[in-house]
Design a protein with these regions (language model features):
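A conserved FAD-binding loop/helix module that cradles the flavin
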Residues: 54, 472-494
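Mid-domain catalytic core of redox enzymes
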Residues: 220, 250-372
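C-terminal segments that line or cap access tunnels to active or ligand-binding sites in enzymes
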Residues: 320-429, 433
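A glycine-rich dinucleotide-binding beta-alpha-beta segment and adjacent secondary-structure elements
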Residues: 181-195, 356-362, 416-476
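Short beta-strand to alpha-helix junction loop
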Residues: 162-171, 214-234, 394-402
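Helical element adjacent to the flavin cofactor pocket in flavoenzyme catalytic cores
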Residues: 208-259
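Rossmann-like flavin
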Residues: 92-202
Length: 497
């Protein structure tokens, strides 16, 4: 039995903790805040509950597997429901496309109806190409440790597979090569933002998101996606995992190139055989590990080379429909601007708040997330530059004015927000940096803005012996499915007690 310390009670940390405890290890989780979940939280304000982090569950099989292998099935604990339709996309020219859930044929028909036969055929091409990419990348890239490119060179099918995933082709370039309808190109571009990236430079393999969403579906957890955090903490505790909340880790201690424990802010030293870091990798290697630890230098250099992911500016809106007419929205809604490229230019190059942002609205059709038939809870998110005072945008100022600007745009879209507004709370990238310990408020750690980006993420198994990294800033990346896979990779690397 190994004594394992997990730094951070996010989804990745708890998923790893549950698997390791089931494998016979003694596990303790240390969390800086007063609750588990990291960015994955459902929070109540007044009469409304909001998913303040992830608001969509894809690839639920990742968590079905986790719960099945550690105890009771997830279906016995959580009510996981398909969201139908999956998405509603709205464009500045007045066109609107609704993607049905779990039905590619129905999606093709919807696209043909709105955009014409060529567009429908184009989307079918997209899904077929995305499926082939997924088949190539899933096992050897996504579900395996990815420590270097060299082992991949031994693959006999490497040339064919590289041609399929097109590692040196950007998502935007692939859209252009396929001559996609401009409306569909915007939808494809948006997949880059799922990893905090710019579609003009992010690799084409992110197209796999289209296949995963359409084939494995879009799902909601009754009561909010944050219920997954609650269920994971409960599962961990059932398996004997201990939690210490409001406990800040000051340092991961390393002696002779091997971790030997952690030093807490209250000066307690906790010895351990292994440390699983669920904090942002940039924070782990630059703040928690001494600069004198040479084995960490390679990771520091990689992280320095990587482009940081974008952040987000969010609004939590509690709406009262007795005050005005209810807007007709689906669960997941996207409103694109006229000039989508300008958004990426302002975020990544100018590093300023987007003047005319794409707006995502999560408007759950979940009665357990509001008190009162007349109430609605909307989570509104726009992409934003990181919080970087001195070299970029300082998000400690101007948040209220930017929130008002977004509400005005929502009103101009005919969504009747101002007259129905019962509650408003906004969160800036600076807030995200503060409560999630995410440098600059980056949602996904590093972006995927180059062909080498996958190799610039933190390795799951560090060169510092006994140290493992899990979560959105480590391989294979951000988002609930990948974070769950990250935890499985780490648990398998550590093995049974």
């Amino acid at each position: 039995m190994s004594k394992v310390v997990v730094v951070g009670a996010g989804i990745g940390g708890m998923s790893a903790a549950a698997r390791l405890a089931k494998n016979g290890h003694k596990v303790t989780v240390y969390e800086n805040s007063d609750r588990s979940g990291g960015k994955c939280r459902t929070e109540w304000f007044g009469d409304s509950a909001f998913d303040t982090g992830p608001s969509l569950l894809t690839l639920p099989a990742v968590y079905r597997d986790l719960f099945l292998k550690t105890g009771k099935r997830i279906e016995h604990i959580l009510n996981i429901e398909p969201v139908d339709p999956a998405f509603n996309y709205n464009f500045s020219d007045g066109k609107s496309i609704t993607f049905p859930n779990l039905s590619n044929p129905a999606t093709y028909l919807e696209i043909k109806k709105i955009l014409g036969d060529d567009a429908g055929s184009g989307w079918q091409q997209i899904i077929e190409r995305a499926e082939r990419m997924w088949d190539v990348s899933r096992e050897q890239f996504v579900e395996s440790e990815l420590n270097s490119f060299w082992p991949l060179l031994k693959n006999r099918n490497l040339v064919t597979q590289l041609r399929e995933i097109a590692p040196f082709t950007s998502l935007r370039t692939l859209s252009n090569q396929l001559n996609l309808d401009p409306h569909l190109r915007m939808i494809v571009d948006r997949y880059a933002t799922y990893t905090g990236s710019d579609p003009r430079s992010a690799p084409a393999v992110l197209l796999t998101i289209a296949f995963v969403e359409s084939t494995f579906g879009a799902w909601h957890i009754k009561g909010g996606i944050g219920q997954l955090s609650v269920a994971l903490q409960n599962r961990c505790e059932e398996l004997g995992v201990k939690f210490e909340f409001n406990t800040r880790v000051r340092e991961i201690s390393v002696k002779s190139n091997r971790v030997d424990g952690i030093l807490l802010e209250d000066n307690r030293f906790i010895s351990s055989d292994l440390v699983v870091a669920n904090a942002d990798a940039e924070y782990v290697y630059n703040k928690l590990i001494s600069k004198n630890v040479r084995s960490a230098n390679n990771e520091r250099r990689k992280l320095k080379k990587a482009t940081k992911s974008l952040s987000g500016f969010s609004l939590l809106l509690g709406l009262d429909n007795y005050k005005g007419e209810r807007a007709r929205l689906n669960h997941h809604n996207v409103f694109f601007p006229e000039n989508y490229d300008n958004e990426f230019e302002e975020i990544f190059n100018k590093k300023i708040p987007v003047s005319d942002p794409t707006i995502y609205i999560c408007a759950p059709k979940d009665k357990s997330m509001v008190i009162g038939e007349n109430k609605e809870s909307w989570f509104v998110l726009v992409n934003a530059p990181r919080h970087e005072p001195g070299i970029g945008w300082d998000w400690t100022q101007g948040g209220e004015d930017y929130a008002k600007k977004i509400i005005t745009k929502l009103d101009n879209l005919g969504l009747n927000v101002s007259s129905r507004l019962d509650f408003l709370k906004f969160r800036t990238p600076a807030d995200l940096e503060s409560y999630a310990m995410a440098p600059g408020g980056s949602i996904y750690g590093t972006s995927s803005n180059s062909a080498k980006s996958a190799f610039l993420r933190a390795r799951n198994r560090s060169k510092t012996k006994g140290l493992f990294c899990v979560g959105g800033s480590a391989h294979p990346g951000g988002g609930l499915p990948l974070v769950g896979i990250s935890a499985e990779i780490v648990a398998n690397a550590i093995g049974k007690a």
